[in-house]
From Swiss-Prot:
Protein name: Ribosome maturation factor RimP
Main location: cytoplasm
Gene: rimP
Keyword set, alphabetical order: Cytoplasm, Ribosome biogenesis
Disulfide bond is among the record's keywords: no
Family note: Belongs to the RimP family.
Physiological role: Required for maturation of 30S ribosomal subunits.
Length: 174
């Protein structure tokens, strides 16, 4: 991950506080675009299980807008749009707590090196740089999958990108 500008770190701290005041947690923040198309995007979630409502997004947006609009110098470069939403069904996983929340769900991970570099010897997996399987566990060091008796441990430092995989399951007819 790249270093954020210092103003972005300030905005992230404020966004964390505003989200917490609404009973939410800041899942991720990004600033994208150029000129009048610049957008500050916040993704909020619950630390534990539970859904984020439109009202939660609205309250966080209003609370943050109030603070940012009071100090026009906080975000350099003039106009920007503010978007507040949930991370979505196929959310990106970046922080250890994101992975912990995804335990028992299917995730996609792209690594920076082949899996043999972390001790995977299985013929099918040792040269792989991607895994799309159900996440068995996650801790502060990395993640763990077990696929047909093959254990795959991947440290966070080796993860290039990761996301939750949405699996559509068709409902049963009654």
């Amino acid at each position: 991950m790249s270093e954020s500008p210092s103003w972005m770190a300030k905005v992230e701290k404020i966004a964390n506080d505003v989200a917490a005041a609404q009973g939410c947690v800041l899942y991720d923040i990004e600033f994208v675009g150029l000129g009048k198309g610049r957008t500050l995007r916040l993704f909020i979630d619950r630390e534990e299980e539970g859904a984020i409502s439109i009202e939660d997004c609205t309250n966080v947006s209003r609370g943050l807008s109030e603070i940012l609009d009071a100090d026009e110098e906080m975000i350099p470069g003039g106009e920007y749009n503010l978007e507040v939403s949930t991370p979505g069904l196929d959310r990106h996983l970046k922080k250890p707590w994101h992975f912990k929340k995804a335990i028992g769900k299917k995730v996609y991970i792209k690594t920076t090196k082949a899996l043999e570099s972390v001790g995977v010897e299985d013929k099918k997996w040792k040269n792989a740089k991607t895994v799309e399987e159900v996440l068995e566990s996650a801790d502060e060091q990395g993640v763990r999958f077990v696929v047909k008796d093959v254990e795959i441990k991947i440290p966070y430092a080796m993860i290039d990108r990761a996301k939750l995989v949405f699996e559509y399951t068709k409902g049963q007819k009654k």
